[in-house]
From Swiss-Prot:
Keyword NADP appears in the UniProt entry: no
Organism of provenance: Mus musculus (Mouse)
Keyword field: Antiviral defense, Coiled coil, Cytoplasm, Metal-binding, Nucleus, Phosphoprotein, Transferase, Ubl conjugation, Ubl conjugation pathway, Zinc, Zinc-finger
Taxonomic path: Eukaryota, Metazoa, Chordata, Craniata, Vertebrata
UniProt record similarity statement: Belongs to the TRIM/RBCC family.
Name under which the protein is recorded: E3 ubiquitin-protein ligase TRIM11
Length: 467
């Protein structure tokens, strides 16, 4: 047999009788014929048998299909030796027959073989009839799509207009922010200059009087020292020398009258008050309550754990490690390890109190100095403000009724304010905080009104007082 005949026979043996193309995943029926798995599946489209072989029409009760792997290899060899030729337009790719009809169910072009095989139960129409019908449907779809396109273009124009408007609004607000903060900077700079000028005027007004008093005292000290030295020397003289001109010496002693300096008020009239500062700090407000397990037995806490005052007698409470004793202190429940925090405390007319923060690990059982070295950063009021690290400074004309405490953990900043008028009371030197900090409260004296943690609401600075 010639080589071309062998090649032709290989093509014929590797070709499916249904699709007339090389086998794809060939399977064998009970009668021994081979077909592509997908071709025979579509040919046997009905769910129940009997099933007829497309070649010999032999009936089979079940779909017994066995994979034919050798035939699959043969089909692959034939496909490599003789690749399928391109299918001309208008010709069925499966059967190489002219496309003459259109399947309305699968929306596909059919040749006569397709129509008689897997599409024999479908709605099949001539090409021109199907084309005319689909053309009408396409024209309706085009009309709908054109309307959709008009709407899309309108929406696009509106979206672009909205984007431009949004950018304009953002830019306007940006300019408002820049302008407002520039105004605030000018206002703060002017306020700073006014306060510094007032301080300088106070300094120039009071300091000469203080220096005059100090100079006068210096002169008196010099005169007293000279007189003392003279009398000490006279006491060492013999009787004649001691008594000689003694009248003059005694007269000068009797004439000595120490003139104390004039009393100069040590109250600064100028206070550091930044406009709007308290309102800004209230943005960092926290909801702080008292921890009863840390309260000294002499302290009485309210039911809502927001108020504390000295009791009339010591309570019988467990001596747990967290409790302050003997110090009259109580801590807040909140544990601070980062961030900015602000709270306000109503102290009313109490004559002495202490507020601030302390380390979680600070000693609460020994009576010692509540200093930063021991883990305490507190402001104490005893008629004047002071803390354990700084010398006492002069009393205010009007001690605050409400105290604001601001803590910036990362910045190492702790400051105290009069929450009533926003004036600065005290700022601790910059501190490197570490570990957990807790708010500290201490009513140092008995008072009919308690020390109360205020409820702060709203960002604008609106507050609810002690509840």
């Amino acid at each position: 047999m010639a080589a071309p005949d062998l090649s032709t026979n290989l093509q014929e043996e590797a070709t499916c009788a249904i699709c007339l193309d090389y086998f794809t995943d060939p399977v064998m029926t009970d009668c021994g014929h081979n077909f592509c798995r997908e071709c025979i599946r579509r040919c046997w489209g009905q769910p129940e048998g009997p099933y007829a072989c497309p070649e010999c029409r032999e009936l089979s009760a079940q779909r017994n299909l066995r994979p034919n792997r050798p035939l699959a290899k043969m089909a692959e060899m034939a496909r490599r030796l003789h690749p399928p030729s391109p299918v001309p337009q208008g010709v069925c790719a499966a059967h190489r027959e002219p496309l003459t009809t259109f399947c309305g169910d699968d929306l596909s072009l059919l040749c006569p073989i397709c129509e008689r095989s897997e599409h024999w139960t479908h709605r099949v129409r001539p090409l021109q009839e199907a084309a005319d019908d689909l053309k009408g449907r396409l024209e309706k779809s085009l009309e709908h799509l054109r309307k959709q396109m008009e709407d899309a273009m309108l929406f696009q124009a509106q979206a672009e207009e909205t984007c431009a408007l949004w950018q304009k609004m953002v830019e306007s607000q940006r300019q408002n922010v820049l302008g407002e903060f520039e105004r605030l900077r000018r206002l703060l700079a002017e306020e700073e200059q006014q306060l510094l000028q007032k301080l300088e005027e106070e300094e120039l007004e009071v300091l000469p009087r203080l220096r005059e008093g100090a100079a006068r005292l210096g002169q008196q000290s010099t005169q007293l020292a000279a007189l003392i030295s003279e009398l000490e020397s006279r006491c060492q003289l013999p009787a004649l020398g001691l008594l000689q001109d003694i009248k003059d010496a005694l007269c000068r002693v009797q004439d000595v009258k120490l003139q104390p300096p004039a009393v100069v008020p040590m109250e600064l009239r100028t206070v550091c008050r930044v406009p709007g500062l308290v309102e800004t700090l209230r943005r960092f407000r926290g909801d702080i309550t008292l921890d009863p397990d840390t309260a000294n037995p002499e302290l009485v806490l309210s039911e809502d754990r927001r108020s504390v005052q000295r009791g009339e007698q010591r309570q019988a409470l467990p001596d747990n490690p967290e409790r302050f004793d003997p110090g009259p202190c109580v801590l807040g429940q909140e544990r601070i390890t980062s961030g900015r925090h602000y709270w306000e405390v109503e102290v009313g007319d109490q004559t002495s109190w202490a507020l601030g923060v302390c380390k979680e690990t600070a000693n609460r059982k020994e009576k010692g100095e509540l200093s930063a070295g021991n883990g305490f950063w507190i402001l104490v009021f005893l008629g004047s403000f002071y803390n354990s690290n700084e010398p006492a400074f002069s009393p205010l004309r009007d001690p605050p009724k409400r105290v604001g405490i601001f803590l910036d953990y990362e910045a190492g900043h702790l400051s105290f304010y009069s929450a009533t008028d926003g004036s600065l009371l005290f700022i601790f030197p910059e501190t490197l905080f570490s570990g957990t900090l807790r708010p500290l409260f201490s009513p140092l004296s008995s008072s009919p009104t308690p020390m109360t943690i205020c409820r702060l609401i709203g960002v604008s600075g609106d507050t609810l007082g002690p509840q």
